[in-house]
Amino acid sequence: MPELPEVETIKRTLAPKILGKTIYRVEVYLPKIIKNVSVEEFTRRVVGKEIVALKRRGKYLLIDLSGKETVTVHLRMTGKLLILPKGSPKDKHTHAIFDLGDLELHFNDIRQFGGFSFEMPEIGPEPLEDEFTPEYLKTKLKASQKNLKAVLLDQKIIAGIGNIYADEILFEAGLSPKRIAASLSEDEAEELFKAIRKILALGIEYRGTSIRDYVDAENQQGSFQRLLKVYGKNGSLCVRCNNVLIRERHAGRSTHYCPHCQK
C-alpha cells in the first residue's frame, strides 16, 4: 500500500507534468472507483477544469482544480497514477483515463480498492510538519491503552504511516510493537518521535518502497526496500543484535520485529 513517502513521491513526479493542464475528457471504465457521487457528476465537475495545485495529506493525494474543486485520490492497496503519452493503450487494470491534451493520466488498480472523491476524511497531523511535535505525540501516547503498532497505524493520530514504515520506525526506536503506548517513558517517546521523522524522511529521499506493486507516476520504482531492517525479514538475523527476527499479527497486521532488542 502506498504510504506517506510513496504518495509524496507520486506527487513530486506528477506535479511538473500536470500542473497547469486542463482536463479535457475523463473515461471511467470501473464506476466503483468514483466514490460518493455518480460517474456523471464526477465528470461534470472535473472536465474543463485546470489543475492548479497538487498536495498530499497523509496517504491521500489532493488535486486542486479551477473553480475551487478538489479531487481526493486514495490509492489504497495497489492503485497507481501514471503519466503517459496521448493515445497510450489501456491495460486490463486501467480503470480511468484523464485526457490532459498532450498527455494522459491513467489510474490503474489491480485490487480495485482505490478511487476518487470530493471528500477528505479527518486525519491527524503530518508527521514531517511543525504541527507534529514531541509534546503532541507524548500526549497521544499517554492517553492510549493500545499497542504501539496500532497507534502508529491510526490515521487520526498520525497521518500517513502504514505497515512497512510502522515496523521500521519501531525498530529504529528500539520499541516492541506490543508495548502499550501509555507505558512509554519520556525518553522512549522522544526516541519514537525522532524515529518517525527519520524513517519517513528517508522513505521520501529513496522515493518510496517497491516490494510488490508500487511505482511513481513515471513508472519508476523506489529504493527504500534496500534499507529495510525488519519488514519482510522474518527468519533473518537482526542487524543490531544478531538474533532472529519474527513475524506476528498486531493491530490486525503482519508485524516484523526483533523480540530481543525491541523492548
From Swiss-Prot:
CDD domains to which the protein is assigned, alphabetical: EcFpg-like_N
Coiled-coil zones: none
Active site: residue positions: P2, E3, K59, R253
Reported cofactor(s): Zn(2+)
ZnF locations on chain (FPG-type): 229-263
Disulfide bridge positions per record: none
Keywords from the UniProt entry: DNA damage, DNA repair, DNA-binding, Glycosidase, Hydrolase, Lyase, Metal-binding, Multifunctional enzyme, Zinc, Zinc-finger
GO molecular function: 8-oxo-7,8-dihydroguanine DNA N-glycosylase activity; class I DNA-(apurinic or apyrimidinic site) endonuclease activity; damaged DNA binding; zinc ion binding
Cofactor note: Binds 1 zinc ion per subunit.
Gene3D superfamilies: 1.10.8.50, MutM-like, N-terminal
Residues that coordinate or bind DNA: H93, R111
Gene Ontology BP terms: base-excision repair
E.C. number(s) listed in UniProt: 3.2.2.23, 4.2.99.18
Catalyzed reactions: Hydrolysis of DNA containing ring-opened 7-methylguanine residues, releasing 2,6-diamino-4-hydroxy-5-(N-methyl)formamidopyrimidine; 2'-deoxyribonucleotide-(2'-deoxyribose 5'-phosphate)-2'-deoxyribonucleotide-DNA = a 3'-end 2'-deoxyribonucleotide-(2,3-dehydro-2,3-deoxyribose 5'-phosphate)-DNA + a 5'-end 5'-phospho-2'-deoxyribonucleoside-DNA + H(+)
Classification via HAMAP family: Fapy_DNA_glycosyl (MF_00103)
Subunit structure: Monomer.
Family the UniProt entry places it in: Belongs to the FPG family.
Function summary: Involved in base excision repair of DNA damaged by oxidation or by mutagenic agents. Acts as a DNA glycosylase that recognizes and removes damaged bases. Has a preference for oxidized purines, such as 7,8-dihydro-8-oxoguanine (8-oxoG). Has AP (apurinic/apyrimidinic) lyase activity and introduces nicks in the DNA strand. Cleaves the DNA backbone by beta-delta elimination to generate a single-strand break at the site of the removed base with both 3'- and 5'-phosphates.
Protein name: Formamidopyrimidine-DNA glycosylase
Native source species: Carboxydothermus hydrogenoformans (strain ATCC BAA-161 / DSM 6008 / Z-2901)
UniProt lineage: Bacteria, Bacillati, Bacillota, Clostridia, Thermoanaerobacterales
Gene that specifies this protein: mutM
